[in-house]
Structures are given as C-alpha cells and as structure tokens.
C-alpha cells in the first residue's frame, strides 16, 4: 500500500516493481492503480452542515487557504476535495464563502496561527458591532449601520489543525463552543481527551484496511490465474473505493448537556468499482 502524498514526485513504477499496489487517498479522477480514498468531499460537507445545524451563520475554513469554486471543480487532492465539500455546503445554505473566511492551517502549529487570526477578526467584528450599536442609539442618526458579523463556526481540514485553532482562540480569550464552534476531520484519538472534546468526522479506518486487502488479494489471485505478468499489463482495470465516515458531535460544537450518547452515521461507504 502507498499513501500518495508521502511519495509525491516518485514514479509509482519505481515503488511497486510489478507487484500489486493499492494507493491510499490518491484522489485521482481516473486512477491507474487500485485506490482507496477518504470521504473527503462528503465528510467536509457533513461537517459544515453540522455547524449550520448548530446555528452558525458565518463559518471559517482552516486548510490550504481560499480557492475559487471554479478551481475546485477538478481537484485531485484530499485537501482540495475537503475545501470543495465545505464551500459547497456553505453556498447551498446561502452563507458566505470568500477570502475573508478562509485561513491557512494544516497542523497544530499553523492551526494556532490561524486561531490567532480568526480571534483577531472576531474581536474586530465585535468592536465594530459595538460602535454601530452606540451610533444607532445616538440622536439624529440617519446612516445605516451594521458591519460584517463575527465568525461563529470553524471547519478545520483535519483534527490537528483544529487542536491548534482551539489553542490559538484561547490565547485571545475566545471560548469554544460558547463564542465559536469548531469541528475537525479524521477522528484522531486525542480529540476525545481535549478540553473541550473535539467534534470530528471519524473516518472508517477498519474499512480502509479491508478494502485495500480485498484489492491486493484480487490482484494476486488474478496474476496467479494468468501468465504471471504484472497487474497493470494484465488488462484488469483499476478499481476505486471510498470509505465511510461517522459524524461525531462533541463539546466543541455541542454543549455537554446536549451531546448525543452515540454518533450519527451520516453516510455509507462506496464499495470498490472500476474507475
């Protein structure tokens, strides 16, 4: 098995040497090797929909930074697909998706920086709102008031970025989930022990292992029944599967009193099929 991002720039033929190979989360539209992908787009969409269901109206995305929707149409990366799913959920709900709600952060350290930037934006929006309120109460006011509302929800492209974001927000006195709600992606075990515990999109790693094993077994059996040629020259088309996920609401989006005793399964996996 091969995690594509960790072998970027290395020809796959130099890795497999004619042996069965399964790529993990390669995200290619037309794969040349058997591939098992994470539920990147659907999972991100579900995460943002959860924030919306929790009452969020201005949702920030922490990941690779802003990309126009036209550029997301044919992305072939997990981060790009997650951004496509998240932005699609925002636009479908009539909520803003623009540069002002996108922040760069892919790990804990950059997540802290993103948390600081979001906190500063929130405090600025609060100050503007206070100024507008004071002005609207002044005698003789005729000018329309009302600035950009403060960010009240954050979707992070992975859990470790979310850990950093929560820390960065805390540095500015921003409370989660009281002031802003945060959700991550992947289902890192540490999210069960943080304060607050982290809401996340839990990917089915057991299913990933099973799909990958089934693909390798199929290739080996096909080769043994044939003339011993490499898998790719044997003419059997590459297959692609997407594992399932579970939306796990925890304290970072839902107050402890309202946490569901069991996570909600928001989708089923897509079984292996020819690309």
Predicted regions and their residues:
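Central regulatory/effector-binding core of bacterial HTH transcription factors
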Residues: 4-9, 29
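Generic N-terminal leader/processing signal
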Residues: 1-2, 133, 230, 266-269
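Short, charged beta->alpha transition segments
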Residues: 8-11, 47
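Conserved small/polar residues in nucleotide/adenosyl-binding loops
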Residues: 1-5, 257-263
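Bacterial carbohydrate/catabolite-sensing allosteric modules
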Residues: 15-257, 275
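A short, hydrophobic C-terminal helix/tail in secreted or cell-surface proteins
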Residues: 260-272
């Amino acid at each position: 098995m091969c995690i594509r991002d960790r072998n970027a720039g290395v020809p796959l033929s130099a890795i497999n040497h004619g042996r069965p190979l399964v790529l993990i989360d390669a995200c290619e539209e037309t794969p040349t090797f058997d591939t098992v992908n994470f539920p990147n787009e659907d999972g991100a969409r579900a995460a943002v929909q959860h924030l919306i269901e929790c009452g969020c109206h201005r949702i920030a995305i922490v990941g690779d930074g802003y990309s126009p929707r036209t550029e997301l149409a044919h992305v072939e990366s997990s981060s790009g697909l997650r951004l496509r799913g998240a932005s699609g959920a925002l636009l479908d709900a009539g909520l803003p998706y623009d540069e002002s709600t996108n922040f760069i952060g892919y790990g804990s350290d950059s997540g802290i920086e993103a948390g600081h930037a979001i906190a500063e934006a929130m405090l600025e929006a609060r100050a503007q709102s206070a100024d507008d309120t004071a002005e609207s109460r002044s005698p003789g006011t005729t000018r329309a008031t009302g600035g950009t509302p403060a960010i009240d929800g954050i979707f992070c492209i992975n859990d470790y970025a979310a850990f950093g974001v929560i820390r960065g927000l805390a540095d500015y006195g921003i409370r989660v989930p009281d002031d802003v709600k945060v959700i991550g992606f992947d289902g890192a075990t540490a999210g069960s022990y943080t304060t607050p515990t982290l809401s996340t999109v839990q990917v089915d790693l057991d299913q990933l292992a099973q799909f990958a094993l089934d693909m390798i077994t199929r290739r080996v059996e096909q080769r043994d029944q044939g003339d011993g040629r490499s898998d790719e020259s044997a003419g059997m088309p590459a297959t692609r599967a997407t594992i399932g996920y579970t939306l796990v609401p925890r304290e970072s989006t839902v107050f402890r009193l309202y946490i569901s005793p069991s996570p909600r399964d928001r989708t089923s996996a897509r079984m292996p099929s020819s690309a």
